[in-house]
């Protein structure tokens, strides 16, 4: 059973995506912000993290992704966001870009259809990202 950490402040989307992932056989832990995400990871390391780009402020999701990639380089990350938010933050981040500035296996524009998210999670897990 794959353990997925779903990090997003939108409770409605979290509920929909969690239900779809659980129905697909995944064990899902949720967090609404970076503090909750870090606490959840401290309790149990997930097999994959799905996170919103814009947590707790302009770049908190990006910062969390970079931090997780540094400490857990084999942990697959899928990032969700509204396209305009990602582009704006990516432009700001480009000022100090390096090869690991966006260490995610997949960007997905919100709202993501639950079945599409399930497919991407399954694909990332099977690919061994």
Residue map of PLM features:
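Acidic catalytic/metal-coordinating carboxylates
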Residues: 33, 59-63
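Short alpha-helical segment
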Residues: 36-38
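Conserved phosphotransfer cores of two-component systems
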Residues: 42-44, 67-74, 99
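Active-site beta3 strand of CheY-like receiver
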Residues: 44-51, 55
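Alpha4 helix (beta4-alpha4-beta5 surface) of REC/receiver domains from two-component response regulators
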Residues: 63, 83-109, 115, 119
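The C-terminal output helix
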Residues: 112, 122-129
